[in-house]
Amino acid sequence: MPTLYVILSLLLGLIGGVLVQRAIGSRQQAVTDDRLQREAQAEAQQIRAEAQRHARELHEAAEQDRQDAISKTQDAARRVQDAAERDTLAAAHEARLDEQREQVRALRAQLEAEREQAKADAAQQREALSTDRQETRREREDLGREIERLGRRTEQLDARSDKLDALEERLEGGWREVQRQEQEVAERLRQADLKLYEVAGLTPEVAREQILGRLNAELEEEKAIRVKAMTEKAGAEARRSARSIIAQAIQRSASETSAQLSVSVVPIPSDAMKGRLIGREGRNIRAFESLTGVDLIIDDTPEAVILSSFNPLRREVARHVLDALVADGRIHPTRIEEMVHKAQDDMKTFIHQQGEEAAIEAGVVGLKPGLVQLLGRMYFRTSYSQNVLKHSVQVAHLTGIMADELGLDAALARRAGLMHDVGKSIDREIEGTHVEIGINLARRFGEPAEVIDAIAHHHDPENGETLYSVLVAAADAISAARPGARREALESYVRRLEQLEQIAVAFPGVQQAYAIQAGREVRVIVQPEKVTDAQATLLARDIAGRVEQDMEYPGQVQVTVVRESRAVGVAR
């Protein structure tokens, strides 16, 4: 804008100069050229000065207008900036207010949730307190019953003590009677000596030997009769007490008699699935069998396939894999391998759960995790079709009951009963008998000496160092001998009976042998003219030893030798 004013001023000055020149030319005739020229120059300078002044004024005015415009623009920009800053501050303040409002709402919701949680916790605590009160009440009732039982037990012990005192008094009386009889015999011997010296004319040494020989024979017979009577009486009382304890233990214990087979039948949605399980050129079934170690039998059975394996653990893993493959629908070697690894991991968790449940059911606490895992493995182990883990739990119950009746540590007895067959959990993976493996495992996990002794001698309790091995052996026999607890194939059962009879008949002097009571007893008839009563006892022990050495059988086999003498007389 100021530049435009300058240009206009210059144009006006030029126009004025041109006009002046023209005026000067028209007036040349009236004045001289010099004067006119000077006047024209003076006037031109005046006009130029006026134009320059006017231009300067216009420039100054334009500059002032520019400065005013810049100032107004800056003021407007400042006002706009201030307004924008105020809007920004207001927006930030509003955002902070919104954020604070959200925080307040969140805090209020959190407080409400905490209040609800506190109410729920209070209700749970009240319920837990009520449960604890009920548990305490039941414990008090159990304690009362236990006190009553202990009172009855104390009364029984007192009665037994009285009987023992009476028996001791009778024994003392019998001993005094024996001493009196010995004195009488001594007196009779002295009198007999005198008579023998007088009548027979024997020397004192010879007479003394004859009398002592006769007297020793009489005393030996009398002592044998008394010892036999006392032994029979003590044995009868011991058998009666043992029967009572075992009967109580059996009455208070009950368990399932189910058994596992060596095959599992897995249902499938349709027979078309069988072809997918086999796969192209049999690659799926080969991958399945190689990864699981289980035979997959696909036959004409409608909507079902069969898994066959002697190892129940592998068979269970294979069943889980097959169920997952059928449900998923994607069946190929890679997917089969993934499912096998997943099923094996799941099976480890399942095994640990089974071990924990067995320990809880048996009332045994404080087992180390590795030992619990080994217990869980026995869930998939069978002995004569009897589940070893269920058998161990039942042995633990029976051992605890009998130990309680005998005044022993019931908790320690249950622990020994539960652990007695722990070696069977890995006896197919490690060399050695399940007894040897169980002893090593118990020592490795720091089990008490009583538990180790029970594991070592639950098949030969007569060599055990503690009573717990005897109780575990008895409970083991009770659990195995229950009807339906164990079973075997008919062919092997008949073969075992025949082998029992053949072993017994092979001994000299045996006339006949019969396997009775489902093979748990062999009755041997001997020839009385070839086998004496003393030899019959030795023969029974020898036959039992040969059976233990040559045969495998569940439980125990009793050998009974029968010797019968017949005397026939004919009256004519």
From Swiss-Prot:
Entry's EC annotation: 3.1.-.-
SUPFAM superfamilies listed in its UniProt record: Eukaryotic type KH-domain (KH-domain type I), HD-domain/PDEase-like
Keywords: Cell membrane, Endonuclease, Hydrolase, Membrane, Nuclease, RNA-binding, Transmembrane, Transmembrane helix
CDD domains: HDc, KH-I_RNaseY
Sequence intervals crossing the membrane: 1-21
Region (Disordered): 59-85, 110-142
Alphabetical GO biological process terms: mRNA catabolic process
Sections of the chain in a coiled coil: none
Top-level taxon in the UniProt lineage: Bacteria
Domain HD: 388-481
Its job: Endoribonuclease that initiates mRNA decay.
HAMAP family linked to this entry: RNase_Y (MF_00335)
Entry protein name: Ribonuclease Y
Source organism of this protein record: Deinococcus radiodurans (strain ATCC 13939 / DSM 20539 / JCM 16871 / CCUG 27074 / LMG 4051 / NBRC 15346 / NCIMB 9279 / VKM B-1422 / R1)
Gene that encodes it: rny
